[in-house]
């Protein structure tokens, strides 16, 4: 009887395995029947599009298409764009530069704004602007949810529009739209390069979600909900893999600093010194260094200066709480001769930013420090220079800021920085206790600020060292480094064009 039961069980198992195998085989066959033709169609479509748009590339010239949809924004990213173009114009006057932009200003208005904002005089003979009408697809406001993937897919729509209007020899993305890379590489046949200010996604972002930590890109509604946390973690990991794939299409990657470089190396699997290079962004070091040092002659006031847009990640609350702690622990800062003041300088983009400023004003009242706090919104360059010439301490509180142009400007102007002990300021800009200070907590910030203001004579040398250390962030240094790494691509393009011309002849 036992043998019969065993035989029935074995036969049942065999039948079950055969049934499962046949089902799987049928499923695989169905997938093959459906997927293989689809893959063939996609490949055929790519080849057809490559023939159509690749043939539009003018082989009689070398052109560089700069993908920068917001070229008139007037920030650090735009200084990178215009300095890069200026460098190309001076070194390769015969190379055609094209800027893909969604801005509606006329050419003259853009040229004039670049001159007024950055004091950069661009040549007009070999620079043109191609207007893009689909910029709304990369605006964060278009995607209240799934912003990362939404903007990334949206950039492909914008990139397609750009490709259909002009196919460059070299495509250079300078705003972080990596999903445009395969479009220009596979279909346009362009050599892809990029300048990365910060990775679209990083291991820090994933770790923040994994640990359920609250941050500006991981709000309480997600960090406090396990299901949402797991869902977002899956979303981030999938996006990270796709980001790695599109990043592989770039033959040259320039990054603004060590922190960004390390993350891009890990995500895109690039190699420092081979296809990944650090090129510090250009900062108006020359202009800031013209300001008088005036450390001991009374020119510098007991002013703490903050330069940062009023965005949540800039963490202005920490600055106010630092001042409150300073005034509480060292009451002498409330009175003459110290009478220490915090001046917050920054721009506002929208109503949310304006509301944030109002919240900060209310916080200063709650902390009983409103008489020692001043807000300067959207001030002129001359007004900023005046503040830079009067301030003694600069405060920077953003965690993991990819670089920190504001910190460099402070140092060049003769303002001793107390910056956040993370990312760009820590790895590339401030040498702790040599050219400034690095802090993480309210207590650390307050102690360093007190030390600088109360014992001013000890920091004469630090002020000079801080200013001298900013030479590596000058426009001329950026130009030299940028040309060093873009030259091989331009020279290779010239050789390819010459070879194609000979074949046609």
UniProtKB/Swiss-Prot annotation:
Disulphide linkage map: none
First-listed, main subcellular location of the protein, grouped into a coarse class: endoplasmic reticulum
TM segment ranges: 4-24
InterPro entries: ALG11, ALG11_N, Glyco_trans_1
E.C. code: 2.4.1.131
Pathway: Protein modification; protein glycosylation
Ranges in the topological domain labelled Lumenal: 1-3
Cellular component terms per the entry's GO annotation: endoplasmic reticulum membrane; lipid droplet
GO terms, molecular function: alpha-1,2-mannosyltransferase activity; GDP-Man:Man3GlcNAc2-PP-Dol alpha-1,2-mannosyltransferase activity
Signal sequence, start to end: none
Localization of this protein: Endoplasmic reticulum membrane
Pfam families assigned: ALG11_N, Glycos_transf_1
Keywords of this entry: Endoplasmic reticulum, Glycosyltransferase, Membrane, Transferase, Transmembrane, Transmembrane helix
GO biological process, alphabetically ordered: dolichol-linked oligosaccharide biosynthetic process; protein glycosylation
Known catalytic reactions: an alpha-D-Man-(1->3)-[alpha-D-Man-(1->6)]-beta-D-Man-(1->4)-beta-D-GlcNAc-(1->4)-alpha-D-GlcNAc-diphospho-di-trans,poly-cis-dolichol + 2 GDP-alpha-D-mannose = an alpha-D-Man-(1->2)-alpha-D-Man-(1->2)-alpha-D-Man-(1->3)-[alpha-D-Man-(1->6)]-beta-D-Man-(1->4)-beta-D-GlcNAc-(1->4)-alpha-D-GlcNAc-diphospho-di-trans,poly-cis-dolichol + 2 GDP + 2 H(+)
Membrane topology: Single-pass membrane protein
Top-level taxon of the source organism: Eukaryota
Residue spans, topological domain Cytoplasmic: 25-145, 167-402, 424-505
Classification via SUPFAM superfamilies: UDP-Glycosyltransferase/glycogen phosphorylase
Intramembrane extents: 146-166, 403-423
Enzyme class: transferase
CDD domains reported in the protein's UniProt record: GT4_ALG11-like (cd03806)
Function field: GDP-Man:Man(3)GlcNAc(2)-PP-Dol alpha-1,2-mannosyltransferase that operates in the biosynthetic pathway of dolichol-linked oligosaccharides, the glycan precursors employed in protein asparagine (N)-glycosylation. The assembly of dolichol-linked oligosaccharides begins on the cytosolic side of the endoplasmic reticulum membrane and finishes in its lumen. The sequential addition of sugars to dolichol pyrophosphate produces dolichol-linked oligosaccharides containing fourteen sugars, including two GlcNAcs, nine mannoses and three glucoses.
Annotated family: Belongs to the glycosyltransferase group 1 family.
Name of the protein this chain belongs to: GDP-Man:Man(3)GlcNAc(2)-PP-Dol alpha-1,2-mannosyltransferase
């Amino acid at each position: 009887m036992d043998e019969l039961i065993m035989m029935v069980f074995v036969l049942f198992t065999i039948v079950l395995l055969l049934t499962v195998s046949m089902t799987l085989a049928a499923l695989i066959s169905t997938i093959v029947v459906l997927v293989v033709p689809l893959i063939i169609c996609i490949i055929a479509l790519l080849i057809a599009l490559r023939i159509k748009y690749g043939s539009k590339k003018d082989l009689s010239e070398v052109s560089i298409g700069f993908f920068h949809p917001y070229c008139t924004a007037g920030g650090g990213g735009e200084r990178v764009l215009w300095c890069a173009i200026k460098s190309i114009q001076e070194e390769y006057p015969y190379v055609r530069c094209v800027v893909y932009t969604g801005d509606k200003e006329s050419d003259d208005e853009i040229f004039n704004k670049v001159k007024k904002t950055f004091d950069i005089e661009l040549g007009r003979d070999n620079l043109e602007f191609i207007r893009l009408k689909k910029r709304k697809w990369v605006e964060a406001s278009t995607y209240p949810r799934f912003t990362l993937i939404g903007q990334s897919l949206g950039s492909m729509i914008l990139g397609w529009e750009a490709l259909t209007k002009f196919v460059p020899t070299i495509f250079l993305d300078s705003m972080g739209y990596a999903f445009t890379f395969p479009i220009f590489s596979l279909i346009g046949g362009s050599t892809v390069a990029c300048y990365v200010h910060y990775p679209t996604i990083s291991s820090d972002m994933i770790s923040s979600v994994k640990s359920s930590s609250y941050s500006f890109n991981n709000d309480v509604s997600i960090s406090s909900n396990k299901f949402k946390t797991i869902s977002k973690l899956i979303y981030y990991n999938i996006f990270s893999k796709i980001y790695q794939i599109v990043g592989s299409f770039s033959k040259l990657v320039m990054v603004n600093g060590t922190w960004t470089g390390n993350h891009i190396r890990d995500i895109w699997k690039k190699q420092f010194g081979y296809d990944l290079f650090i090129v510090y962004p250009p900062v108006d070091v020359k202009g800031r260094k013209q300001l008088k040092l005036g450390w001991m002659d009374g020119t510098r006031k007991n002013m703490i200066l903050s330069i940062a847009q009023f965005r949540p990640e800039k963490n202005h609350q920490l600055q106010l709480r630092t001042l409150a702690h300073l005034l509480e622990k060292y009451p002498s800062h409330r009175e003459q001769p110290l009478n220490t003041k915090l001046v917050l300088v920054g721009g506002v983009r929208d109503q949310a930013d304006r509301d944030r400023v109002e919240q900060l004003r209310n916080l200063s009242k709650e902390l009983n420090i409103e008489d020692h706090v001043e807000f300067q919104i959207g001030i002129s360059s001359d007004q900023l220079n005046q503040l830079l010439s009067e301030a003694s301490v600069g405060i920077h509180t953003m965690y993991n800021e990819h670089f920190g142009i504001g910190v460099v400007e402070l140092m060049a102007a003769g303002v001793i920085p107390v910056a956040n002990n993370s990312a760009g300021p820590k790895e590339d800009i401030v040498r702790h206790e040599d050219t400034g200070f690095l802090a993480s907590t309210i207590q650390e910030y307050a102690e360093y600020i007190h030390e600088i203001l109360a014992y001013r004579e000890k920091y004469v040398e630090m002020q000079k060292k801080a200013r001298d250390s900013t030479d590596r962030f000058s426009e001329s240094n950026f130009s030299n480094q940028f040309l060093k790494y873009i030259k091989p691509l331009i020279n290779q393009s010239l050789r390819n064009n010459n070879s194609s011309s000979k074949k046609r002849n």
